[in-house]
From Swiss-Prot:
InterPro entries: GIY-YIG_endonuc, GIY-YIG_endonuc_sf, GIY-YIG_UvrC_Cho, Hlx-hairpin-Hlx_DNA-bd_motif, RuvA_2-like, UVR_dom, UVR_dom_sf, UvrABC_protein_C. It is found in: Cytoplasm. One of its GO terms (biological process) is nucleotide-excision repair. GO terms for molecular function: DNA binding; excinuclease ABC activity. It comes from Dichelobacter nodosus (strain VCS1703A). This is UvrABC system protein C. Belongs to the UvrC family. The lineage of its organism: Bacteria, Pseudomonadati, Pseudomonadota, Gammaproteobacteria, Cardiobacteriales. It comes from the Bacteria. Residues 19-97 form the GIY-YIG domain.
Length: 607
């Protein structure tokens, strides 16, 4: 399997991927998640995708679209399964089988009732308190059986509960307190429910301390049977605590860990929202100087949460220089108390270890890829017999739709990789629709006019996406503007437009040059060319969609500029407006019932 359009070197990538269990996300050039998978051994599983033979048609189609792969390791395969399920629900990847809904994993539920029911539940969560999800129904049944043995909360349906005149078998085998016939007071039952809720929400240590006190009090009062019951409760709860593998429902928590090496840093953030929506992301902040890990985290937090929701608790791998000040700052900014901790316990301690491991692994991979980019620059110089290795590469690409909405992009790479802060887009005006030569000439003139003024850095190599004709436009501009010291190269698609068969046109040469499809120089050029194409296409689509959106609304009578703006602002975009009912549309200021019906009819004409 060969896809030279990856954002990474597959061999380098695989050599640094963890051998732990975990989850991987495959993304396209736009960052869209194409596929989410789990693995008992990430390296072993991912190596399968890079085999030259034996891949299914679906897998080959997937790998042709893959641009980047992100991994997150987990302590257990069960947790990888849960994380995979959460990510599939979140991103709805088109290469995954999207049949799983909330019925995929079971929860333990406490119903809303004067005498709540404790039971296993699978489906969309509505009324009640839900705890989970559990990795499989067997583990959930096992936990539920122990909880019923410990807390003796009723498992029966409400209809069964309200029609009892005597205790059922569950009471006889000491699995229920029989609240249906008054064998326990409402106050005592509520206290037991709270004990169960405390344990399921992670407050198990406090609960165990309380039960230990009850056991000692019963023993001191010579209530040995009662003391033995509480002792057994404590023992069973300890068993659950040790074997528990569910994602515990808790307050919103972010876990941040930093890893540093060779003057670089990776900050890994693990997000927990209500203990259910779990995802992970790696960030690589630029360091102006060597800083302690705590200082890196503190600087990162200030920027990271500037426009993001702040959770109630943040677990950190390192103490910050100003812990109290940062906590106060976040609390004021979010209007709720924010706790920072570097010494988590129980499940959060495991989350922190997992995040630290991912930070280290991602930093190693990041450093390896940077080294790989340097090697590719070196290979490029060797392939074209240049005496000096280039420092800066640029590539320009033109995109349009049947001659309309023409835009150009220019992407920049140095030996560390993409320099996205220097990327530029250009809207092309004043040319005949579809005239790519004129578009290329215009964008190169605009690009180098600024560079000659000192607004940016001159590239060493300038790639033009196109063949000999496009290269001639660039040569003409360079001669007109007296640009020197920049190597021009035209990148033409090869036979059948297949990646790896590209031809390279140089000024004043009558024949194109070629490179081996698997060479590092070829991979680098294709990577840069594809990135320029992606950047141009994304801008082109936005411009086209905006024009289509506005023109569609402009065709509706009595909808002027202010009403168009109000509609799009209220629903976010045209897609949101298309999904709205006439009643929803009337909620927009200035839109009457009659006008809402008119808008709805115009948008759905022909359906």
């Amino acid at each position: 399997m060969n896809n030279s359009g990856f954002a990474f070197d597959p061999d380098v990538f695989l050599s640094h991927v963890s051998t732990l269990s975990g989850v991987y996300q495959m993304r396209d050039q736009n960052g869209t998640v194409l596929y989410v998978g789990k693995a008992k051994n990430l390296r072993q599983r991912l190596s399968h995708y890079f085999q030259k033979t034996g891949l299914s048609v679906k897998t080959r189609a997937l790998m042709r679209a893959v641009y980047d792969i992100q991994t997150t390791s987990t302590p257990t395969e069960a947790e990888a399964l849960l994380l995979e399920n959460n990510l599939i629900k979140q991103y709805q990847p088109k290469f995954n089988i999207l049949l799983r809904d909330d019925k995929s994993y079971p929860y333990i539920c406490l119903s809303q009732h004067d005498f709540p029911r404790l039971f296993l539940y699978r489906g969309a969560r509505k009324n009640g308190d839900f705890f989970g999800p559990y990795p499989n129904v067997q583990s959930a049944h096992h936990a539920l059986a122990i909880l019923q043995k410990v807390f003796r909360l009723r498992p029966c349906l409400d209809s069964f509960f309200k029609n009892r005149s005597r205790p059922c078998l569950q009471y006889q085998i000491k699995r229920c307190y029989a609240p249906c016939v008054g064998k326990i007071s409402a106050e005592m039952y509520a206290q037991t429910v709270q004990h169960a809720r405390d344990f399921l929400t992670g407050n198990s240590e406090h609960l165990l301390q309380t039960l230990t006190e009850h056991m000692l009090q019963a023993s001191a009062a010579q209530q040995y049977e009662r003391a033995a019951i509480v002792r057994d409760q404590i023992s069973e709860l300890r068993t659950i605590q040790q074997k528990q593998s569910m994602v515990v429902y808790a307050a919103n928590v972010d876990v941040l860990a930093v890893a540093t090496a060779y003057g670089k840093a990776c900050v890994q953030v693990l997000f927990f929202r209500d203990g259910h929506s779990v995802t992970s992301q790696a960030f690589f902040p630029k360091l102006p100087e060597l800083l302690p890990a705590g200082a890196i985290l503190q600087a990162f937090i200030g920027q990271f949460y500037h426009q993001r929701p702040v959770p109630s608790q943040i677990v950190l791998s390192e103490a910050l220089p100003d812990m109290d000040a940062v906590s106060e700052f976040l609390s004021q900014m979010s209007a709720h108390t924010v706790t920072l901790t570097t010494q988590p316990r129980a499940i959060r301690k495991k989350w922190l270890r997992m995040t630290q491991e991912n930070a280290r692994l991602n930093l190693r991979l990041h450093l390896a890829q940077k080294l790989s980019m340097h090697e590719r620059f070196k290979a490029l110089a060797q392939a074209f017999d240049w005496q000096k290795m280039p420092q800066r590469l640029e590539c320009v690409d033109i995109s349009h739709m049947q001659g309309e909405y023409t835009v150009a992009s220019c992407v920049v790479f140095d030996r560390r990789g993409a320099v996205k802060s220097d990327y530029r887009r250009y809207k092309i005006n004043g040319i005949t629709g579809g005239d790519d030569y004129a578009a290329m000439k215009q964008v190169i003139k605009r690009r180098f006019a600024r560079l000659k003024k000192g607004e940016g850095v001159m590239p060493d190599v300038f790639f033009v996406d196109g063949g000999r004709g496009q290269l001639q436009q660039a040569i003409a501009v360079f001669e007109e503007m007296q640009i020197e010291g920049v190597q021009l190269i035209g990148v033409a698609k090869g036979e059948g437009r297949k990646a790896g068969l590209e031809q390279f046109w140089f000024p004043h040469e009558n024949r194109p040059r070629t490179l081996p499809a698997d060479s590092q120089a070829m991979q680098l050029i294709i990577h840069i060319r594809d990135e320029a194409h992606r950047f141009a296409i994304s801008a082109h689509r936005r411009g086209r969609d905006k024009k289509v959106r506005v023109s569609l609304l402009e065709e509706i009578p009595n909808i002027g500029r202010k009403r168009r703006q109000a509609l799009l602002q209220h629903f976010g975009n045209l897609a949101g407006l298309m999904q709205a009912s006439p009643e929803d549309i009337t909620r927009v200021p200035g839109i009457s019932v009659k006008l809402a019906a008119q808008i709805y009819a115009a948008l759905h004409q022909g359906e």
